[in-house]
């Protein structure tokens, strides 16, 4: 699945999270894994995109950490080489994803796709659907764009406060 460059760039209220430099060439390789990368700014605003590569979850997460560009109030964040203080497994996702906490206003979630057709809407409701992906049976996903937009708007206002 191809996503435009703007799916890898998220900006709100003087916080910029930029993953446009994270590029992979896709090859037919039996070792390839599919991943979803969620970007989050100000705890309320989300975007996500897909990547296919032959890296492990852990290696890809470190690469994302190294490639991530974070600008807060026009000051660029320099990633310390000691990444272990910023990266953790996501236990609520059965360790199928990892969280990169860059600062209190920006984080990235790198998740291994559990099913080939696994996709999520942009914005916060898509991330909520992602958080329920291990539920059995899987809860239905709202497909009406008007309902989804209203839910996103309401959640973004509540979470941003």
Swiss-Prot record:
Highest taxon listed in the record's lineage: Viruses
Family matches, as Pfam families: DUF918 (PF06033)
InterPro entries attached to this UniProt entry: AcMNPV_Orf57
Protein name as it appears in the record: Uncharacterized 19.0 kDa protein in LEF8-FP intergenic region
